[in-house]
Regions:
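N-terminal secretory signal peptides that target proteins for export/translocation
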Residues: 1-16
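Extracellular glycan-interacting surfaces
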Residues: 15, 20, 24-27, 32-669
Length: 669
């Protein structure tokens, strides 16, 4: 049960254990490291895993993500800045941040790898996060819980997949205090008695344990708990150590005798009992917050009664209460980012300015207003979809009404200004000045399908497949979908198509005049008569993951894939592997910048932009953005890229680049 508690839904790079061994010191650190690199524009929000404040200045707040990146705020969470990156890749989940209450320059960050589940690190900073190092004794451990003793801040306790570990010297040395052959493993939560650092509670993926003597002896504390309960969070009352709260997949439990027996708390619906975090108000111990997968719950009478104080759609990962002012509550959430309350959790507003953690799949600059841009995102359900900025990315608003939580893979704009979106379930159009997207999924020629009556006309079926790419030409709209290639000659009012040469699962389509190229993950099909007839381009059988196709103005076809970038100068009859300055594999996108007659490419292995002025025969290494890139565009003379975790990023205004105007038109997944 517990092993699957956190599903991090972004594509990430695999970081081998061998590579991790090369990074015993922090690989990225504070704000100076980001100077001169590209700027993240948004959209604001996304997943937040953890929050922590400086004990001597609670307006100084730190934020942990699911990709190893830390953010900080110096104004109480009103604005955020990218602060540091921990680990060598993008797979470290920072679920716990701890700051020494006696010496706030000492910080700790617990990490576990979403890729391997079994590895991770414990990071330590002595200078308020300016520099970080891994603690060697904990290197490689998947650390799921971390606590500092309130009575002795030199004492830390960490919970990992392989047991419980304790340090009595601020992390310099560590001892495993759980027996290697015991059931005390797969630790999910840790709590230390605020008055006695030898009393430690450990929640596992199967009930909880307690030691009264610093780990020399442990005993099961499960009386009153439902068997097979994953214990996600444990807190000990700051004023009365006999009172202990524990949250599990079966509900919330309270003990009034230091964990010897528990009583299940009533009043919360079963669906909301997956409580990821419990947090006690530091100024009022009768107030306890429960962050669940169905909203935030609050008790003001020490657990006798509970009320939900947010919408049930809010998934809460962490709760922070200002020690100076109990009215000020902040939440780390999935998809919504940081939510802040100034009235004791009666109401919340987003507080994400400067913080973005979104997987952007599409960037579109408005044809008539260069300051207006649109982006499509995935994985954020009702809080995602499409976002629009009308001030060149300084501010964003969600514009997803009618999409009903769909992922958006591609965005295009018709000649009349209408927007077209390809989603994980069909296509949608947003008319000019409209506030709601409308479906455009009528298919008129699916042989053998049952007739369905609509208000406008009779159609054979409704397209519900994934739409990975859309191409709009002066005469035809084309859609690459998981159910085939579809075309429309009436601006999307109806579509016809399906399988092409027996292939259906298309991921990309591009057209130049009558030349059309459409790709599955392993094949490229080419038409020289606008889709009337097709030919298979006979790619190597080694090609397994095509990410997108592109066509230059002189008719050369190119594609980006896991196996590298390939070019055909003869309409798909033959292919050559483009290298000569370009990485030989893991190309995430290749774009043709029509206005500047050049190719731009990105790779999943680097944040560098690659450029070719000779149709791919040779490549020059461009700027290192500091971000993992997926797709590249040129907007108002500056390069802009989508990322899997950091929204969209833009080239610095003073950075040397040859582009002057235009847009690179390739979109890949």
């Amino acid at each position: 049960m517990g092993a699957n508690r956190d599903m991090i839904s972004a594509s990430k790079h695999f970081v081998s254990s061998k590579a991790l061994l090369l990074v015993l010191l922090a690989l990225c650190c504070a704000s100076a490291a980001w100077a001169g690199q590209w700027t993240a524009l948004g959209p604001d929000g996304g997943d937040v895993r953890s929050l922590a404040y400086d004990p001597q200045n609670p307006d100084h707040i730190f934020l942990g993500t699911s990709t190893g990146t830390l953010f900080s705020s110096t104004d109480g969470g009103k604005s955020w800045a990218r602060f540091a990156h921990l680990g060598s890749g993008d797979d470290y989940v920072i679920d716990h941040l701890a700051i020494d209450p006696q010496s706030p320059n000492k910080m700790y960050a617990a990490a576990w790898s979403v890729e391997t589940q079994q590895s991770g690190d414990l990071f330590h900073s002595e200078d308020a996060g300016q520099t970080w190092e891994t603690l060697p004794a904990m290197h490689g451990k998947s650390i799921r819980a971390l606590a500092i003793s309130a009575s002795d801040s030199k004492t830390l306790v960490a919970g990992a997949v392989d047991g419980v570990f304790r340090s009595s010297d601020s992390g310099k040395s560590w001892q495993k205090i759980s027996a290697s052959n015991s059931d005390i493993h797969s630790i999910e939560s840790i709590a230390v008695d605020p008055k006695n650092s030898n009393v430690i509670y450990a929640g596992t993926w199967h009930l909880a344990w307690k030691t009264d003597d610093g780990g020399a002896n442990w005993h099961h504390i499960s009386k009153g708990m439902i068997e097979d309960s994953d214990v996600f969070s444990i807190i000990v009352d700051s004023t009365n150590s006999s009172v202990v709260f524990a949250s599990a997949c079966s509900g919330i439990y309270k003990s009034q005798n230091a964990g010897e027996t528990f009583q299940k708390i009533q009043g919360m619906p079963f669906s909301a009992r997956r409580t990821r975090v419990l947090k006690q108000d530091p100024a009022n111990p009768a107030i306890v917050y429960a962050g669940t997968t169905e909203g935030l719950w609050k008790t003001i009478d020490a657990g006798k009664t509970w009320n939900r104080v947010t919408d049930p759609e809010v998934v809460v990962n962490d709760v922070m209460v200002d020690p100076r002012n109990s009215m000020r509550v902040m939440l780390a959430t999935d998809r919504a980012g940081v939510l802040a309350s100034t009235d004791g959790a009666h109401s919340f507003l987003t507080s994400n300015h400067g913080y973005t953690h979104r997987y952007v799949t599409a960037i579109l600059a408005d044809k008539s207003d260069p300051n207006t841009m649109y982006v499509g995102v995935v994985n954020d359900r009702e809080l995602g979809g499409v976002f629009v900025s009308r001030d060149a990315g300084q501010h964003w608003i969600q514009n997803s009404k009618g999409l009903d939580g769909r992922d958006v893979f591609t965005l295009k704009q018709a000649s009349n200004g209408e927007l077209v979106a390809g989603t994980n379930r069909g296509m949608f159009i947003l008319a000019q000045h409209a506030t709601e997207w409308s479906p455009i999924n009528d298919i008129v020629n699916r042989t053998g399908s049952r007739y369905v009556k609509t208000g406008q006309h009779e159609v054979h079926s409704i397209l519900t497949a994934r739409v990975s790419d859309i191409e709009i030409t002066p005469t035809t709209w084309m859609a690459a979908t998981s159910a085939g290639l579809f075309t429309s000659s009436n601006q999307g009012k109806s579509w016809n198509g399906g399988a092409v040469m027996g292939k259906e699962d298309f991921v990309s389509v591009r057209a130049q005049g009558k030349l059309v190229a459409v790709a599955t993950r392993s094949d490229v099909l080419v038409s020289k008569d606008n889709g009337v007839t097709w030919q298979d381009s006979s790619l190597s059988t080694s090609i397994s993951s095509i990410r997108g196709v592109s066509i230059t103005s002189d008719g050369q076809i190119m594609f980006a894939s896991r196996e590298g970038a390939f070019r055909s100068p003869n309409g798909g009859a033959g292919w050559e592997h483009m290298q000569n300055g370009l990485p030989d594999k893991n190309i995430s996108s290749i774009s043709y910048d029509q206005n500047n007659q050049r190719l731009l490419a990105t790779s999943t292995e680097t944040g560098v932009v690659f450029e070719s002025q000779d149709n791919g025969q040779s490549w020059t290494r461009g700027p290192d953005t500091g971000y993992p890139l997926r797709n590249i565009s040129v907007v108002q003379g500056r390069m802009m890229a989508s990322t899997p975790f950091d929204g969209i990023v833009m080239q610095p205004e003073n950075e040397d680049h040859s582009a002057s105007t235009g847009t690179a038109t390739r979109r890949t997944n």
